From Swiss-Prot:
Subunit organization: Interacts with host PYCR2; this interaction results in autophagy activation.
Membrane topology: Single-pass membrane protein
Biological process annotations from GO: symbiont-mediated activation of host autophagy
Glycosylation sites: N131
Swiss-Prot/TrEMBL keywords: Activation of host autophagy by virus, Disulfide bond, Glycoprotein, Host membrane, Host-virus interaction, Late protein, Membrane, Transmembrane, Transmembrane helix, Virion
GO cellular component, one term: host cell membrane
Post-translational modification: Contains intramolecular disulfide bonds.
Transmembrane region(s): 150-170
Native species: African swine fever virus (isolate Tick/South Africa/Pretoriuskop Pr4/1996) (ASFV)
Role this protein plays: Essential for viral fusion with host endosomal membrane and core release. Not required for virus morphogenesis and egress. Induces complete autophagy through the interaction with and down-regulation of host PYCR2.
Protein family per UniProt: Belongs to the asfivirus E199L family.
Name the record gives this protein: Inner membrane protein E199L
Amino acid sequence: MSCMPVSTKCNDIWVDFSCTGPSISELQKKEPKAWAAILRSHTNQQTAEDDTIIGSICDKQGLCSKDEYAYSQYCACVNSGTLWAECAFAPCNGNKNAYKTTEQRNILTNKQCPSGLTICQNIAEYGGSGNISDLYQNFNCNSVINTFLINVMNHPFLTLILIILILIIIYRLMSSSGGKHNDDKLPPPSLIFSNLNNF
């Protein structure tokens, strides 16, 4: 059974890994190196080479970059786009056939999972869609909601909007406090932004 992805955008939030994808016997025949990497992952013996063999949508290489596998159970850890998937995302940490990278293995073996995420072992609902999912992820775990902010600096357009908003707020504050002194008045925002374009 092929699992066609809804999106192939790097780090797009995806939670439905219910499609098991090609069977294990089919995976063994078609992708023996990938299956061997998954087996090593079962015993925490995966290597950096295994990480490359499995790959991801973001890597644009390896098993998990291929349409038929990208959103299968095997790729639930590397392609979910969720924070701390190895700690708190059931299709990843609750599935032995989901390949965990060497980094994810180290987080688990060194017990570096944030303690507040343990309540999310069984995710009842997952929030975030479209552009909003680029900003936050909601884990709704048995009526307890944890929101994790993603680094806005990874999104240049959102960063630009944030900078413009900050400049407008600063301008408003300065112009309202210095409004009584005509000599201290700031230029209008349109002039400020037109000067920014000259840089």
